[in-house]
Amino acid sequence: MAIYHMQAKVVSRGSGRSAVAASAYMSCSRMYNDYDGIQHDYTRKQGLIYQEVMLPPMAPLEWNDREQLWNAVEENEKTKDSRLAREFVVALPVELDKDSNISLLQDFIKKNFVDMGMCADFAIHDTDGHNPHAHILLTVRPLNENGTWPVSYTHLTLPT
């Protein structure tokens, strides 16, 4: 039987976090944060099954590179306590194979976030073969129609 678990967090400078570091961790990669000059290296981390960046059509193509996407977010958010990203950790059903879990996540992320103008970066981890889960990192602000960030943003209206 599938076990449900979902955890939601905010990545903010006020809590000492970085969107670049969060993305590097979940993608088991090395990324340089232009904002603070720190290199984040998680290339020795194990268990990465799949990773993908999903963008709305108005997003710049270079944001398909997660390092450029999250550095753009870090540059746009100016204050020392800025909210940089929303992060979800979601358990995936062990009953589904890898391709089914990927498809499930892509559909969920597209319908709930990307179609509303948000950029999404996700990775599937399963270190021991018994705990498949996904890390989803989302931009806090959806993009405007012209591919720029809004000056301020207060709420997200969910589709009915």
Stretch-by-stretch model annotation:
Residues 1-156:
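N-terminal nicking endonuclease/strand-transfer module with a His-rich metal-binding environment
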